Amino acid sequence: MSLLLARAAVNDANIHFDRLYSYLIPAQLVGKVYPGSMVLVPFGRGNKARMAVVLAVEEAEETDAPQRLKSLYDAAPEEARLTPDLLELVRFLKERTFCTWFEAVKAVIPYGAQYRPAMVDGRPVMQSRLTRSTEKLYTLAGALPEKPKPGPRQLAAVEALKNGPLTARQLDEVGISRATLDGLVKKGILTAAEQDKALDLFAAIPFDPQPLTLSAEQQQVFQELLPSLEDDKPHAALLHGVTGSGKTIVFLRLIQRTLALGRRALVLVPEISLTPQMIRRLKSTFGSRLAVQHSALNNTERLLQWRMIQQGNADIVVGTRSAVFAPLQNLGLIIMDEEQEHTYQSESAPRYDAHDVAKKRAVMENALLLFASATPQTETYYAAKSGRLQLVELRHRYGGRPPPHVDFIDMRAELAAGNPREVSVRLARELQENLDNGEQSILLLNRRGYRTIGMCTACGHVLKCPNCSVPLVYHKPQHALLCHHCGHTVYPLPQTCPECGGKINYSGFGTQRVEEELAGLLPTARILRMDQDSPSRKDAHETMLAQFARHDYDILLGTQMVAKGLDFEKVTLVGVLGIDSLLFGQGFRAYESVFSLITQVVGRGGRAELPGRALIQTSVPDHPVLQLAAAQDYEGFYREEIAFRRFGLYPPFCSFVVIGFIGDQEGAVLIAAQRFGVLLGEHAAQKPDIPLRILGPAPMNITMLNNKFRYKLTLKCRNDAAFRALLHETLDAYDAEKLPQKASVILDFNSDGDL
């Protein structure tokens, strides 16, 4: 019998050692190790036990020198094995994002499904990171004999199981004891098997299917998408629908058809706060074969939900970015709602864009990928206009409702009139009118904290984080200064300047300050603040939104999490505060982000029978982006934006790649960035067919973060296989350089200009 080799990628290997290593498969593991298997291997001179993933299994050749190879220590059970599809996604992440093999593996499977090395009886073995929680599942295997006459509980058990298998817990709820079940198993009438304990996160949501009644426009969109859903080939489409046009009911109808075809559906949302609303619609319409994947679940919950999907017990999965890796088989439909949101891009390794992974999955599964938004990314809309995506549109609000009426409040005039508050006189008056009418309001301020800057009145010194090159923010509940990047805290609140002893003046405003101001202006108003500081429990967002939906609160004040996808029938007034700082932000997507944010939040008003209105506070009311957003004129904005992108050579007319350099010494980081740029230019000169512009090096927007200095090179390029090969060559050449101090290198292929 020939020897078998496993080609495996090892955990905790840095990028220089991240390659496939060959190990012998010992006799006791033959038949248990396949591509995708998680294994335990000896690594390095000390043969330290390391986790690894098998990428290939091959017969050993003489050239492999099998007598010199090490053997695998252990292999995980079959259930931990990556399916061929998931393994293909690991390869995809590795090739596209330049991450390590195991960084890709950890993105694809949840923490609880991973294993760790352990020692048992002096032998290295693999242990699950979480203790498995199981329960017995009973299945009817035969008929009850007529003699001896069966008892009433035995009859009840058999009757209950005629409609399908049930767990011991479910049978206990109808009065059937474990002793009765065990007796029937001994007689061969039932079979019992261990399965992962079921976790019904949505038990409180009733299954209450209602007819999915589409408007004529919605029905037309559904009919236009239907051929792409049914022909078992990969397709991609963009559903561009104005706010309040009823995109969700089109989703439900498409999912209904997908399930009727015997296939499964994946629904992606950009924020955890949007999952409860989507889950409620899906559970009430389609029942309990529904799973969720997002970071607010604890490790046990995520594992049980993941296993439910893996075992084929979920037909629909809803979740945030990481749900794009859900192990759904026979996937027929992928919906990416609010596709323009930056949260679909990972900010840590692997730095993937869920758009790219969803496209890959659609091709692998012959599925329909549907992007949806009222304000799609410029690149997505350009692709649709160019014919690379099918374009379907909902141009009218559901039920013929008019869009909210939008007015601007010039904050320069407000200040000149003697109002120093953050809430204008008119906004306060209209909030009071809503209170008097029993209606609700939403206020958007995309800035946390109480005061956003502390400055000395004598010398102008700004209080900054000692670890990061950013101002500290005053948070009143803690009576302390906080860094929103590293968490550094200064307590008690400084009153004098550390440089000259002068007085510190705190200015700027965040959600905490506006909440306090509203309480003074509207003493009877019930105000709910929703930002990253307010939730303390994992289900806090869901609880808050449910309270607001019940009208337990009159005003919902929050950051961008209140701007998208929420649907409250009594909200008739939307206010936008502090938008100017975003309008003049850095990055080529700044205008796109502001247009999207305003359009989305304005669209939260007037979604039922009551008309909506919106007030935008700004010092630049005539700015064209604000005017276009107020008019809900996406086409007009797109024409302006695509002209700017074409002139400046920004996506979609090139790929935008940022290479970051991070280290302890600023001078060394700058030298490393300069040297990398030179090497890249030299290698690119040998390949004139690869279009490339190298900009920089330059400091990142936040030059120091967590005591590390940060510089960047910006590349305008065509991100194809040839370009990525060029980057690999340059990285190898950089690694071979004899620099006094090297910097860590980070590549981001989906950047807006910074890391």
Identify the residue ranges that each predicted region occupies:
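Accessory, non-ATPase domains that flank or precede helicase/AAA+ motor cores in DNA-metabolism machines
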Residues: M1-S373, T380, K385-R401, H683, ...
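A short, contiguous, amphipathic alpha-helix enriched in charged residues
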Residues: L5, Y34-P35, R426, L522, ...
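Inter-lobe coupling/hinge segments of SF2-like helicase ATPases
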Residues: P209-S215, Q219, Q223, D232-L670, ...
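A carboxyl-terminal module marker
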Residues: V678, E682-L705, F709, V745-L755
